[in-house]
Amino acid sequence: MRIRPIAAAAAVTLLAGLGTAVTTTSSQAVPGAAATTAAKAAKYEVTATVSRTEPEQGEKITIRGTVAPGEKGAEVVLQKRYGTTGKWTKADTDTLNGKGKFKFSEKVDSVRFRQYRVLKPADDKAKSGKSKKLGVTVFGWRALTSLDPVAVTATSEVGSVGINGNTYEQSIVATPVNSGSIAYNVTRGCKSFQGHAGLKDTSPLTATGDIKILTDTTQAYANSFGVTQSAPVSLDLTGVFRITVEWTSHNTAGTEEDQSGALVALGTPRVLCSF
């Protein structure tokens, strides 16, 4: 009969021990652990756009966007690199406004391809985040004669030439023969061509000259000039690999074999390129 009280006491002791164990395990939980884990897993989302992807040298571009979650006064960093494999460097900083927005402006001063991205550094609220890369190709005007010609026939590059009473620097002029040409590769890296066509002022009044400009194999321009005549030339070079200038002289004072005299000239020819 005494065995029952002993067994009952043992059962009470065992239950008490289990209760203690359960209580002890529950008390080891850290308040806010789930919230901390969630915060560490969060990442800033940065979106950005650029105002122009093909600006001209010296122009200003604007990069703007948002950060989520965004807090007013939080700092964001504009990073830049040249090419696609260069090192990212800090270009500027800005602080978010009350709507989580930022804005950067930069004057592009060199003719080369570059990439931008915007970085939101990490803090106790979220991991760092960055925008997608924004590619910008800067174009600049350069003299056509700054390129090496790939083919030349009876044509010269000169420091200056007089056409219809005006002087043009870095120009192209025919030599006193019947015809000639000069060609340059622009390797699909240029968008526009500008120049001024006519005859060199020392050409005889009896001469007239024809000029043609080819973009690859397409005739993009053609005209004829006498002395005191000239005209501006503007061409689209998008996708063009080679530009060729061809000319022919005609002279009423010449012979059937010799029609030289018209010194066809292209004043200050220049191209808008990304190189």
Regions found by a protein language model. Name each.
Residues 132-275:
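Gly-Asp-aromatic-enriched flexible segments
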Residues 2-140:
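Low-complexity, Ser/Thr/Pro-rich intrinsically disordered linker/stalk segments at domain junctions
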